[in-house]
Amino acid sequence: HDTQCAVAAMSVTDEDAAFLSCGTWSLIGCELDKPMLTLESNQKELSNEMGANGKVNYLKNISGLWLIQETRRDLAKQGQKYSYNDLEMMARDAKPFKCFVDPDAPMLSAHGDLPNKIRKYCEKTGQEIPETVGEIVRCIYESLALKYRYALEQISECTGKNFGVLNILGGGTKDGFLCEMAANSINIPVVAGPIEATALGNIILQLKALGEIESVDEGRKLIAKTEKTKKYMPQRTDDWDGAYKIYKELLNREEK
């Protein structure tokens, strides 16, 4: 499975590391020695998936960069053609923390007219309505970063683990803006890479099966030595703490 292979290719081997396999979807979690089979875990919609090396990948599935991709596609249909770099630059220039969405809200899950759906979500929840393209894209980025924090808090509550670093894997590692925001929101360092985590994880597992390496951990150390990664340190964490308080209240209202 692509997610399990990606996690096998983690470039961070710290015991307190969490992972985020990030692309069209976001799968955030940690490795455990055994499944977490509790009512609380079920209520928080956390899943246990068999991983590499006899471990369990305990995670939450969240929407991901599909939201940016779909927004870009809808804008292009309206004659507004932007590169991903254009969208990032406009988002960087937009007002921070103007409004938020739950990336997993049912009304945002279908194709078509996503910018207007985001506006309607903000109107429905009594928030400021994003008007410009930059405000809409920034809303998506900030909401993803805050949802990552929310999910890791849930995982911490269920496992008792405190996380000291987040390893982002896959195509999302190329999105520096999202990596920055994840570090700021969660208030832990983010290590982005490897990009081709799924392929590398697959290679590691095959090398182990062939006896070329002794363990997945040995393969991860090879990846850490040979693959390019980038580290992001938390910044402006007080601002993000304030935004998270508002965001958490929004999610709690939506869940009722």
Residue ranges and their predicted role:
Residues 1-165, 174-198, 204-235, 239, ...:
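Active-site core segments that coordinate phosphate-bearing ligands/cofactors
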